[in-house]
Each structure stands twice: as C-alpha cells, then as structure tokens.
C-alpha cells in the first residue's frame, strides 16, 4: 500500500500511554517537535485496564475491611458491598473508556497525535496504518522512543483458545461478578485481583505454581498476604499447576490440575506474567528481533544493532521494572536525554545524574493493594547479600510496637523490615506489610534513593501517634540488636 502522506518531527513516540506521555512532555519542554502514535486509547493500559481500574475495584474492599477492624465502626456495616456501585465508580475513573481528555492533553503540550498502528520502517522512520487504512510515514530527526508496553503472557495449555480466559483487561473492565473465579498466578496482579473479586462477592480460588505468594518479595510478604486472603475466604493453593482447561458451557470452565484433581469455576483469570508488545512494530527493519525485550542503557537508549543512537525504549518494553511509575521515570529521563543530545549539550549520566535511570537498579518502589497492604523499595535481604553487601536486618511486628498502628486498626497485624549495609550504615531496602502502609512507601523511597544512613534517620522524627512511627521502632530494633544478619 502506498504512502498517503509524509510528516517530519524531531521525536516520534510509539505509544501514548503514561510512559510515552512523559517522554513526549520532556522532549516538548526541550523545544522539540513531537509526534505520538497510538493504536488504542490514549492513556494506555494503566489508565483503562490496569492500575487505575484495579485500584478503583480494590478501594471499597479495603475500606470495608478497615472499618471491620475498628470497634464501633464495624457495627455500622450492615450489608454487603454494592458491586454495581463499585463498577460505576470504576467507570468514572476510566472515563467510560473515552480517551478524549487525554488526547486533549497531548495537543495541549503541543505534540501531534497520530492514531493507528505504527511500525518502524528503517532508521528514524515510522509508518502508521490509520483506521482508514491509509499509511502515513513519520520521520524523526533525532529519536524514536518505543513505549508500546507489554501484554499478558499466557501459557500454552490445551483448551486455552476455546476457553477464552480472563486476562488483566477482563478482570478490570468486567461489570459482572462470577460466582466462582479461579486466579492462576500469585504475583501482584493475582493477589490483588483475588482480593478485589472475593470482596465483590466471588468465591475465589488462587492457584500458585510456586511454594508461596509474591516470590520476589521478602518471604514474610507472601505469608501475611496469603493469611489475609484465607481469612477473607479465598481458597489459596500453592505448589499446583494447571495442565489443561475446557469450557463446559457458557458459564462453566473446568481446570485440570497437575495433582490429578479438577476445579470447576465460572471464569478463570490468568495472571502469569507479561511479554513485550514488540512483535509487530518493525524491529526487524532495524536489525532487532521482533517480540523481544529491548535492552537499554541508563539513558534508555537501545543497545545492540541500532547505530547512531536514535532508538530509545522506556517502560515495560525494556523489562527493567514492569511498573507504571518506574516507566514514567524512564520516559522523563529519556525525553530529557534526547533534548540534551539534540541541543548538543553534555549528558549527566553519572549515578543519580539528570540523564541516568539509576533508581532502576537501587530504588524501585512497589505497592500491593491487598488486605493487608504491602510496600517495598530497594533490595531485599537476600538481594543485598547476593550483591555482596555486609548486610544487617532489623524486623518489627508493627502492631506490637507502634501506637499509631494500634489506633488505626484494633488487632493490627503487620511487619516491617529494614535492610542496612553495615559498612556505610546506608539503608538498602525497606519492606512493610500491614493496613495503610502503602502511604508510607515514599518516605522509604526517599531514604533509599537519598543514601540516608541509620545515624541520620534518628534525626527524622516521626509524628506520634502515626503508623510512621515504625521508623523509630526499626531504628530501636537495629540499635538494640533485635535483628539478624
């Protein structure tokens, strides 16, 4: 098909989700002409089928759970959660899957939105097939930034195609509550969606192939969240895999498990990881493998066969940290680096420099909106040991020693861990589990990213009585030796 028109930009961004938006905004701030290509909704997966709608589903569930933990408040709960009300609230936060507001934002920063499927067509060139089947060629003077994100990675099991299981999209946009729901996978999506749908009225069975939940976190995170799920009524099964599945009828699915048993549910959600959305973006035209993750340096410049330093990748697609906030950080730095290079200015790529995604290596924050919540940043104790730090760990049971936590919830159950490099006294990582801890995460992130030492932390006085007083209790545990190496 012939090219209908040609357009020139300084920067072309493939993908107008939050990562692409941040890259575009920084490039525009540097005075560059930016074209953004989007084949679905402007705002991307996070805005419509992941972060935002999932938290809209979870918030009412957690709010009710919090109320039930407080004498005097629990008596006010006389009914069940209104799924209809929850779905209506979610729909408002995803603007009924209408992206006109975010499209207006793109034009508001002075960027140009081109709707359609974009593919690389050699160096610095992107060809977009629009909804009218026209082909528009975009040429980038300085850079192309790939921000196409990721898709669900589904296992190759008998019956998958016929069964049409849920992925994160159906789990976050459904307006019907299945009576019985199986969730396959015990990572972040799995435990959050098990929490949400159990709270909305499903009987949820959570299946984990491994020996526990959230295996990349400190071990106590999965233990406490698993206990919370069981207390909420979820059937949690570990060490079990799905061998095959089949749909009995429009409302029933049978899972064949590797222990020989069968599980019959109304719907099944597979939360079994992510794969890069790079299989159909023309990577082969620039010497890269279609469907691969794009390895980048700390400016988000793609390594490998690409010459002249024009191809960047930010967000899920580079496989550094599959988290929206971290991808936005990468997008900002990529956009700033492109702007500096275009102006002929030197780059500050030293650790923690203006053009270095140093936090990807040392200070990635993540939160799980389960019951109890979990939040972590930096290294786990094992990761710190593997990196050959001289590690010392301090642990506390939050509900035993923090008055603010006791006031927050009767019988508060939670745990916090601080990982310290003994040679420098520097904080390497923090993990917290308990009601309300996600709002404490940024203080931990500042401490880790800022190379704050234990000695200096003593001067950061937490307000009494707040859950933040766990910082003081961690310091006391570290000082008094109620910790371990």
What are these regions (language model features)?
Residues 51, 148-203, 236, 284-305:
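Glycine-rich dinucleotide-binding loop and its adjacent helix/turn
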Residues 92-99, 172-173, 178-182, 188-249, ...:
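Rossmann-like dinucleotide-binding cores of NAD(P)H-dependent redox enzymes
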Residues 7-9, 134-143, 258-267, 307:
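Core beta-strand elements of the Rossmann-like FAD/NAD(P) dinucleotide-binding domain
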Residues 2-7, 46-137, 141, 217-244, ...:
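N-terminal Rossmann-like dinucleotide/flavin-binding domain of flavoprotein oxidoreductases
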Residues 76-77, 112-115, 119-132, 200-304, ...:
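A Rossmann-like FAD-binding core segment of flavoenzymes
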Residues 161-177, 262-353:
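FAD-site-proximal beta/loop scaffold in flavoenzymes
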Residues 14-40, 52, 56-60, 369-485:
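Flexible, glycine-rich terminal cap/loop adjacent to redox cofactors
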Residues 28-45, 202-213:
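Glycine-rich FAD pyrophosphate-binding loop
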């Amino acid at each position: 098909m012939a090219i209908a028109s040609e357009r020139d930009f300084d920067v072309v961004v493939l993908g107008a989700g939050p990562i692409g938006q941040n890259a575009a905004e920084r490039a525009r701030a540097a005075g560059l002409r930016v074209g953004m290509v989007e084949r679905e909704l402007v705002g991307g997966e996070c805005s419509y089928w992941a972060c935002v709608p999932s938290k809209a589903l979870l918030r009412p569930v957690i709010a009710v759970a919090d109320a039930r933990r407080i004498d005097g408040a629990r008596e006010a709960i006389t009914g069940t959660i209104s799924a209809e009300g929850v779905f209506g609230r979610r729909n408002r936060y995803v603007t009924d899957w209408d992206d006109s507001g975010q499209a207006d934002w793109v034009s508001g920063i002075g960027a140009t939105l081109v709707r359609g499927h974009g593919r690389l067509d050699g160096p610095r060139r992107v060809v977009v097939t629009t909804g009218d089947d026209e082909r528009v060629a975009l040429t980038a003077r300085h850079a192309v930034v790939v921000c196409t994100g990721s898709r669900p990675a589904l296992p190759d099991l008998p019956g998958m195609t016929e069964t049409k299981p849920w992925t994160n999209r159906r789990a976050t946009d459904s307006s019907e509550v299945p009576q019985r729901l199986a969730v396959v996978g015990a990572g972040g999506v799995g435990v959050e969606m098990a929490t949400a749908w159990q709270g909305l009225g499903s009987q949820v069975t959570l299946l984990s192939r491994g020996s526990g939940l959230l295996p990349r976190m400190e071990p106590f995170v999965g233990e406490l969240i698993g206990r919370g799920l069981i207390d909420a009524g979820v059937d949690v099964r570990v060490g079990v895999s799905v061998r095959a599945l089949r749909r009995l009828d429009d409302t029933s699915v049978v899972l064949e498990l590797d222990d020989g048993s069968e599980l019959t549910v109304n719907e099944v959600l597979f939360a079994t990881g992510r794969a890069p959305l790079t299989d159909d973006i023309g990577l082969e035209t620039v010497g890269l493998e279609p469907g691969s993750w794009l390895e980048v340096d700390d400016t988000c410049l793609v390594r490998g066969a690409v010459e002249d330093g024009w191809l960047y990748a930010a967000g899920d697609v580079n496989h550094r940290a599959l988290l929206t906030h971290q991808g936005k950080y990468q997008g900002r730095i990529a956009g700033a680096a492109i702007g500096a290079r275009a102006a002929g200015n030197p780059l500050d790529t030293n650790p923690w420099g203006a053009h270095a995604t140093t936090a990807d290596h040392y200070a990635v924050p993540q939160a799980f909106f389960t019951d109890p919540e979990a939040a972590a940043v930096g290294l786990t104790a094992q990761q710190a040991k593997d990196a050959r730090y001289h590690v010392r760990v301090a642990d506390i049971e939050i509900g035993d020693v923090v008055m603010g936590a006791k006031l927050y919830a009767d019988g508060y159950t939670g745990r916090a861990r601080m990982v310290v490099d003994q040679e420098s006294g520097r904080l390497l990582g923090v993990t917290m589990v308990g009601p309300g801890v996600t709002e404490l995460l940024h203080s931990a992130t500042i401490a880790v990213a800022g190379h704050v030492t234990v000695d200096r932390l003593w001067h950061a006085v937490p307000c009494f009585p707040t859950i933040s007083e766990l910082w003081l209790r961690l310091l006391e545990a570290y000082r008094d030796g109620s910790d371990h190496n």
